[in-house]
Amino acid sequence: MKNIRTILLAMALTTATGSMAQSDLQQQFANPPQEARPRVWWHWMNGNISKYGIKKDLEWMHRAGIAGIHVFDAGLNTPQIVPHRITYMTPEWKDCFRYAVHIADSLGMTMAIPSSPGWSNTGGPWVTPHDAMKKITWRAVRVKGGKKLTVNLPGIYTTTGHFQNVENTNSPETFSQQIGIVAVRMPDTDIDIASLNPTITVSKGEPTVAQLTDGDYSKGTRVEPDAEGNIWAQYTFEKPVTIKALSLSDGNNRSTWNSWSAPLYYRLETSNDGKTFTKVCDIPQSGTFQQTIDLPPTTARCFRVVCQLPQKDKQGEYVNLMEYNLYTTSRINFAEEKAGFTSFGDLDQYPSRPDSDVSAAGDVVVLTDKVDADGRLTWNAPRGNWVIYRFGTSLFGSRNGPASPEATGLEVDKMDREAVHKYIEHYIDLYRDASGGNIGKRGIQYLLIDSYEPGKATWTLQMPAQFERRRGYSIYPWLPVLTGVIVGSVEQSEQFLYDYRQTIGELMDESLYAEVADAAHRHGMKIYIESHENGRQMLADGISVKAKSDIPMGAMWAEKRADLSMYECDLRETSSTAHIYGKKYVAGES
């Protein structure tokens, strides 16, 4: 009986404790502690601010139970709706910001600022072209060896844009620098298709073979539907030719936010009589401005690409055909994606076909020291057919945004820690002045890196040294693989491309996220960090990126869309980061 009373007493105590805990939880939900209350993003839209409005906003948010604010300068072409527009970081703007800091502090509200004007990512008008995001570019020349050569190499591309000499940004700034000269002895089976004198016909338009195979992306031909509503481009050879790969560029690429698997935009068909065509394969839309795919060896006289989902404008459907090249030797499948020009997430689904008919690793020669200041190469070339590549770098062209015009400039190089250091110290100094020195324990207590949106840069001036330090071998003999050429073997070339992407990801992790987090801590602040948000936006590892934060952050949208599962992945990544690295708090942009 005594034991029964003891058990009943224990049960009663447990029930009472559970009831108290439930009651306590209900009370805390109704009146949450300060650390559990929401923070909000407070956008100062294009200079439409006033002290009167600042005070009203903050007092209203405080009454609503909001515990903190993240103050953004944003633009989005917002029209002026106040009598007097106040420009970013002018003395008058700083006075308003200092007033906001004072009011927020008096109300017990925490304050955060993003890592740049706008919300993505780390850029501003003080970033110089030298310190901005960059891409790798190349020009190619075919020569026959077995003699001393003097070759005037084409100049490196200086265009600001995302790929080669495609102009697709609104950045007027320029920067370019040579990386190196590398020659590759090609297999005897490698033939420039233009030398076979094919004819090019299209559904409606007037491209030339030279224009479609010259590697110049600044010139495109508008190709429209034929009478039956089909858009196509066709090479016809005098005799059957065996083709192992193709590349195609129509000026389109998958946007940063559409990283899911693309719909099928093109297909390849072949024929021997030009009348009856057989489908060879579908061609997924590229994640870059050009796509290279390998093919099963295919022999035919006619090779036709057919567009299934063309663009549309006021004049109707069309394709802006820039390049359409066929190759008689194998190329890297999804070469541009594997070279980092996009962060396509399913590369393991697109392996390159094994082929022994490739350039040997010993058939690569670095010739940088044999080129004079005018770009003239003098070289005793061994026998064989060679392609000489001139590699360079130019600006990627991304700008921070969406900020007010006065706060907009180039995005800093995310792979150059010194450049990021200069950038973030200047940025924090601006806000130290604007806040009257209130950074750290009071005033601006947090920094925030929002989701990554500036695009996929593929080069930094430190890349050769960083690559060799991390991977243990020189990058220079392998640079031609970034163009799609297979060197050594498919396995060796794919390994190099993996190493290249890995290096980009590591440099972003250490140079952007670690440096900005360190800067926040140096100045007494804590930091929120988001990473990919929707899809795979960069080559850095999201968990490693968020591990640099004090508060890892994900994002979610209250929409009914098929791709929202990617946001779930982002939230799971965020919670995983907190569990693995012992973060007390997790934030959600929602």
Functional labels for PLM-detected ranges:
Residues M1-L25:
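Bacterial Sec-dependent N-terminal signal peptides
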Residues P38-S50, P79-D95, T122-P125, I283, ...:
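The substrate-binding groove and active-site-proximal loops of carbohydrate-active enzymes
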Residues G53-A74, C96-H102, R442, V545, ...:
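Catalytic domains of carbohydrate-active enzymes, especially glycoside hydrolases
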Residues E59-M61, H102-D105, H521, K526, ...:
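Catalytic-core region of carbohydrate-active enzymes that cleave or remodel glycosidic bonds
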Residues A74-S195, S330-E337, F344-G345, D355, ...:
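Acidic/aromatic-lined carbohydrate-recognition and catalytic surfaces
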Residues M111-T122, L448-S451, E506-M538, S590:
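Aromatic-lined carbohydrate-recognition surfaces of secreted/lumenal glycan-active proteins
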Residues D214-K279, S286-A360, S451:
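Aromatic, loop-rich ligand-recognition surfaces of beta-strand-rich domains
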